[in-house]
Amino acid sequence: MGRGLLRGLWPLHIVLWTRIASTIPPHVPKSVNSDVMASDNGGAVKLPQLCKFCDVRLSTCDNQKSCMSNCSITAICEKPHEVCVAVWRKNDKNITLETVCHDPKLTYHGFTLEDAASPKCVMKEKKRAGETFFMCACNMEECNDYIIFSEEYTTSSPDLLLVIIQVTGVSLLPPLGIAIAVIIIFYCYRVHRQQKLSPSWESSKPRKLMDFSDNCAIILEDDRSDISSTCANNINHNTELLPIELDTLVGKGRFAEVYKAKLKQNTSEQFETVAVKIFPYEEYSSWKTEKDIFSDINLKHENILQFLTAEERKTELGKQYWLITAFHAKGNLQEYLTRHVISWEDLRKLGSSLARGIAHLHSDHTPCGRPKMPIVHRDLKSSNILVKNDLTCCLCDFGLSLRLDPTLSVDDLANSGQVGTARYMAPEVLESRMNLENVESFKQTDVYSMALVLWEMTSRCNAVGEVKDYEPPFGSKVREHPCVESMKDSVLRDRGRPEIPSFWLNHQGIQIVCETLTECWDHDPEARLTAQCVAERFSELEHPERLSGRSCSQEKIPEDGSLNTTK
């Protein structure tokens, strides 16, 4: 049917396109893109105009009909609101043509730019002593390249417009008919399929752990977040700042302070609670790094802190840089473990969500299959992990993170430096011997740090029996804020790792967790598990019958139940 319709309409297409060709003027300025682009939060941002910019030069153009500027230089205007201008002058000696950018609010050669909003550069004669003077202004890309002196070139033929409408309508008929037919068929199929599905079958259908569609839904909307998804993952490009009222200081780090704040809604009584991370002027680079990480729409994940916007603010204390994110009342993981003893179910949820967040960070694609830039955190620790209301983790504080761009050279990676918190640094980071030829080595350092955080969780789980007060990894073996040299002694010289008491292994699930974290803090980076493998291990913990057939690692726990914690 579609082919027959196209064959029948083909002669009409030829006639209509012939009519269009006969109505086109000798020269039509090239079409341009719009000079605005949509911002992430729905506003519009004015882009600087592209104009011919050759100042004053000799010209062979006369003031009859139209001509080209013959200017070979295209410039980006300095200010977004500037327009393109052309000035044609003739005196007793020569003819000159001038093409520039100019602010339409200001006069040029003593004349106002009356036609600054015009899409074409239509010359208008101005009175000047001793010379013939024409000037035009226009607001389209390179519109001052085509100079028009005659009014007959400034408007399109009514016949041309009519013919274009006719040929467009005829051209769209076949695909429009096919599209409508496909929609009707798909709708009928869905209705028929839903009628066949029994409600009882739907309710008894077992829910999968997490399939492809579940992961895609997480990217579209995170219902478990403490902030409405309509605000999420936007950059505030508008000059008007968000109506935010700072409340209380809830955290302070090396680079910034974190405040609980109120984001006011349409009425003064309504607000949403948000977190505002404020960087001083001196820490611009940390703010920019974190802003650039958050700006990647593919970063969005249920176990990554939900981002709202980034702003630059001027205060009485000077210039500040803000990151505005979701607020999580339970605080960071270190604070939560200090205050609470957790159950086995809590440990499984916290550990699983932590591994999923890191796996997403490290991945080169989203759960939906879209390409994504892999990112390494480089400062993973319990104080940089937040606890959500449903007792799952989300990663935060990306000020030291690194995007593993394939265009980065070995020198670029080497210049990224020895960063992180000494207590959580992997052995190869402590002694600066990372394999810069392989970007996977950066991910392996995150996995080591993750193992220490998993140990912290396990040490506060009541499933292991006696639960001691919270201690960070390596506890009293090092001072409260150890330096790199003291951690070298413990981790490199002594090959020390946090202690795993034998009674922890009496619980089957804890035994698997201990085996997993031991493989993750292996001294050899290449022997460590990946974050994705750890996430799969935790998923298997929901199904004890699967534990004997793990695919990530075939290594079994020794029969005596002991684990080597000093690899």
Curated annotation (Swiss-Prot):
Modification Phosphoserine occurs at: S409, S548, S553
Keywords: Apoptosis, ATP-binding, Cell membrane, Differentiation, Disulfide bond, Glycoprotein, Growth regulation, Kinase, Magnesium, Manganese, Membrane, Metal-binding, Nucleotide-binding, Phosphoprotein, Receptor, Serine/threonine-protein kinase, Signal, Transferase, Transmembrane, Transmembrane helix
GO biological process, one term: branching involved in blood vessel morphogenesis
Enzyme class: transferase
Modifications the protein undergoes after translation, according to the UniProt entry: Phosphorylated on a Ser/Thr residue in the cytoplasmic domain.
A Gene Ontology term for the protein's cellular component: transforming growth factor beta ligand-receptor complex
Residue positions with a glycan: N70, N94
UniProt keyword Cytoplasm present: no
Record-listed ATP binding positions: V250, G251, K252, G253, R254, F255, A256, E257, V258, K277
Region: Disordered, residue numbers: 545-567
Enzyme active site: D379 (proton acceptor)
Main location: membrane
Signal peptide positions on this chain: 1-23
Disulfide bonds: C51-C84, C54-C71, C61-C67, C77-C101, C121-C136, C138-C143
EC number(s) per entry: 2.7.11.30
Cytoplasmic topological intervals: 188-567
Transmembrane segments: 167-187
Catalytic reaction(s) noted: L-threonyl-[receptor-protein] + ATP = O-phospho-L-threonyl-[receptor-protein] + ADP + H(+); L-seryl-[receptor-protein] + ATP = O-phospho-L-seryl-[receptor-protein] + ADP + H(+)
Annotated localization: Cell membrane; Membrane raft
KW Isomerase (keyword) present: no
Xref: Pfam families: ecTbetaR2 (PF08917), PK_Tyr_Ser-Thr (PF07714)
Membrane topology note: Single-pass type I membrane protein
Alphabetical list of InterPro entries matching this protein: Kinase-like_dom_sf, Prot_kinase_dom, Protein_kinase_ATP_BS, Ser-Thr/Tyr_kinase_cat_dom, Ser/Thr_kinase_AS, Snake_toxin-like_sf, TGFB_receptor, Transform_growth_fac-b_typ-2
Assembly with partners or alone: Homodimer. Heterohexamer; TGFB1, TGFB2 and TGFB3 homodimeric ligands assemble a functional receptor composed of two TGFBR1 and TGFBR2 heterodimers to form a ligand-receptor heterohexamer. The respective affinity of TGFRB1 and TGFRB2 for the ligands may modulate the kinetics of assembly of the receptor and may explain the different biological activities of TGFB1, TGFB2 and TGFB3. Component of a complex composed of TSC22D1 (via N-terminus), TGFBR1 and TGFBR2; the interaction between TSC22D1 and TGFBR1 is inhibited by SMAD7 and promoted by TGFB1. Interacts with DAXX. Interacts with DYNLT4.
Name of protein: TGF-beta receptor type-2
UniProt gene name: Tgfbr2
